[in-house]
Amino acid sequence: DGFQLVHSDARLHPHLNLEKRITVVGYMNKGWVSEDTGYLEFWTDDMKECWKQVEPKFNRVVIFENSEFSNHGIPHVNKDRRVFMYTLLCNETFYETRTKAWYKARPEEENHDLVNEIGVKRLKLSDY
């Protein structure tokens, strides 16, 4: 469905021992309109403000650094989105060596069971 909890990505690939540095997301959604939703959101570290929403328009590319402060997610999707994603991995480690994503609740989700349940399940399912 495209829904994605706000999180900062895992920093270290669990098998390759390479640090995830940069993420590139490209949108291929011809005919997308704002009612389709699926905005990529970026949040402050304290989760008090969504400082940027990116519309998944056709031919749009988003590039962002992966760090413990790059909180991002997709709150709601009305229509399937088509995206490609590329991740730059480096063999030098500048940040912490976390192999799991950190999930964070948006202000309206703070005590929401679904957020806690999905976050815990995803942490258990995947190391990257």
Regions found by a protein language model. Name each.
Residues 1-12:
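Charged, often glycine-rich, active-site loop that binds/positions anionic groups
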Residues 11-22, 30-128:
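Catalytic core of Fe(II)/2-oxoglutarate
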